[in-house]
Amino acid sequence: MNKYTASVVGGSGFTGGELLRLLTQHPYFEVVQATSRSKTHKTIGNVHPNLRSVDLRFTDPSELESVDILFAATPHGVSMQQIESFTAAADTVVDLSADFRLNSAEQYDEWYDGHACPEYLEDAEYALPEINRSNLVGASLIASGGCNATATILGLKPLFDADILTGDEQVVVDVKVGSSEGGAGGGDASSHPERSGVVRPYAPTGHRHEAEIEQFLGLSVSFTAHAVEMTRGASATCHVFPSEPVSNSDLWGAYHDVYAEEPFMRTVAGGGGVYRYPEPKSVAGSNYAEVGFERDPENHRLVIFSAIDNMMKGSAGQAVHAANIALGIDETTGLEFTGLHPVGAP
C-alpha cells in the first residue's frame, strides 16, 4: 500500500498531539516529521504520553522536509507568516488555525489584526465536510473550521436548507467549551485552580468565530462563549425565532435530509434514557457530532443543540476528514472510533 508522507507543524500542542494520534494509526499516512520550537529533539512520547510507542522526535520548524501533506497546528498568526515555506514543502497543506478561514483581507482587518499573506485567501477552502465536501476534493490549501463555529453551523445549517430560517431572524448562540480550547499554553485562566468549578463567560460579545458563522450561513448571530469545567468538548445551544410555525415533523425532516447519510452525524432529540440531547461527553475522543432540537411554540422559539469534541470534530478529526476527501481516500478512514461509555470527565 502506498502511503502519503505527512508532517505535523506545531506537534507539541494539544491539537498537534491529536493529529499525531490519528495520523500514526492511519493506514494511508506515514508521519515523517513533527516540529516544535520548544520541544526540539524530545521524543513524541515525552510530550504526549499516550504516544510513547511512536518512534519520532520533534525537529525545529525551520527544517521542514518535503512531504505529500503538511498539517499546521500552530497558534493564530504563525501559518500566514510561514505559508510560503509550507506550500513549498508539501503539495497539500491543512491549516488548523484561523489564518485562512475567512475570505478577504478586510475580514481579517475587522476580526483579527490583518493578514500577512492575503493573496492566499482566495485559494483556501474552508473545511466543514458535511456542508462543503465537494469543495475539498483535490484542494491544495485547506482551512479547518473553528470548533465553536463548527458546532454552531452544524446545528443551524439544516434550518436554512429547509427554508425554516432565511437569515433575517434573530439567532442567539450560547457555547460552552472545555479547557483544551485554550491550548497547551492556555495561561492562568486554564490552570486547574482557576478553572475548576467555573461557568465563566469569556467572550460575551465579539467572539472571532462569529465571522466564520456569518460568512458560512449568511446571517448575523448574537454569540456568547462560556468556559466550563470539562477538558474536551463544545456544546452549542442556539435560540432561533422563525417567522412561521414549525412542527416536529418539519424539524425531523430538515435534519434527516441533510445528515441521514453523513457518517459522523447523529441526530439526538428527546426520547428516553439519560442522554436525550446532544452532549460532549457522548462524542469525546471521536470525530462525531450530535445535533438535536426542541420546540417552544408558546414563545415562537426553536432550541437547537449541537455537541462535538473540540479537539476532534472541532480540530484534528475534521482536518484528517478533510485530508481524506482532498486526497481521494475513503473519508471515514482513521476516524472510525465512536467514543467511550461510561467515561469520566471528557
Swiss-Prot record:
The active site is at C147. Its EC number is 1.2.1.103, 1.2.1.106. It comes from Haloquadratum walsbyi (strain DSM 16790 / HBSQ001). Transmembrane segments: none annotated. It is found in: Cytoplasm. It comes from the Archaea. The gene is lysY. Involved in both the arginine and lysine biosynthetic pathways. This is Putative [LysW]-L-2-aminoadipate/[LysW]-L-glutamate phosphate reductase. InterPro entries: AGPR_type-1 (IPR000706), LysY (IPR037535), NAD(P)-bd_dom_sf (IPR036291), NAGSA_dehydrogenase (IPR050085), Semialdehyde_DH_NAD-bd (IPR000534).
